[in-house]
């Protein structure tokens, strides 16, 4: 009898739970369940150099680093063969659709002593000339939206195997030309961000009697403040992301 009562109680409780789950949710409850993280200034995630782009964006743990390595892993510039270097690139964007959208990148580095390096970079993204209109389709003027970021980086080698680097970044984005829409004044957005980079390298003995090289790289990119184009709108994150990579070198 006791067992029967227990089962009946469980059945009633379960039915009540299912009934509560089937209750329609209010719009306020639905809004509270939305936890999508939105970001802005996506141009910060564009691959700046053709070398890493051709290899599928695997620049975090490259052997033989060059000037562009400051964007992928600042700590890897310690291993650059040359004392100084610079790189400049330009990529047309959606060239088959428009002719005035493009991404430009300029970077350079210099070694300081035997165990340190500094770098600087600028990336610029132009969205081309745009005709703005009001809600009725009447033209309100033309503007060329543009975005840019200025970087300054430093790297140091703590041991023969371990090095660390940081990048500090100023971000500017102007998409509206300081226009007002629907009673809201829009402006250029500014913000700050930074990268933290780590590199660990070691050697393992190979079958041919030599040593193979292994590198592990990590880059936490765009750790920064929220940005907004209007004081009346919510602020959005910059696109923070994590990059990890492994490099292996074997002499044949």
What are the roles of these predicted feature ranges?
Residues 1-23, 246:
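Bacterial Sec-dependent N-terminal signal peptides
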Residues 21-252:
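Subset of outer-membrane beta-barrel
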């Amino acid at each position: 009898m006791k067992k029967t009562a227990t089962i009946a109680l469980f059945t009633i409780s379960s039915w009540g739970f299912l009934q509560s789950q089937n209750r329609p949710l209010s719009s306020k409850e639905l809004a509270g369940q939305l936890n999508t993280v939105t970001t802005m200034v996506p141009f910060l995630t564009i691959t700046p150099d053709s070398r890493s782009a051709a290899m599928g964006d695997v620049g975090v743990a490259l052997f033989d680093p060059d000037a562009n390595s400051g964007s992928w892993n600042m700590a890897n510039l310690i291993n650059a063969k040359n004392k100084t270097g610079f790189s400049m690139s330009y990529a047309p964007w959606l060239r088959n659709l428009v002719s005035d959208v493009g991404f430009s990148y300029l970077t350079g580095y210099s070694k300081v002593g035997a165990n340190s390096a500094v770098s600087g970079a600028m990336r610029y993204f132009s969205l081309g000339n745009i005709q703005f209109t009001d809600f009725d389709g009447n033209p309100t003027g033309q503007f060329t939206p543009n975005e840019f970021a200025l970087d300054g980086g430093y790297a140091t080698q703590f041991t023969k195997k371990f090095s660390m680097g940081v990048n500090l970044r100023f971000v500017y984005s102007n998409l509206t030309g300081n226009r007002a829409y629907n009673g809201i004044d829009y402006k250029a957005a500014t913000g700050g961000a930074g990268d933290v980079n780590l590199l660990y390298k070691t050697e393992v003995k190979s079958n041919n009697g030599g040593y193979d090289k292994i590198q592990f790289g990590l880059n936490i990119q765009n750790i920064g403040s929220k940005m907004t184009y209007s004081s009346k709108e919510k602020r959005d994150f910059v696109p923070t992301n994590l990059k990890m990579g492994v490099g292996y070198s074997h002499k044949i």
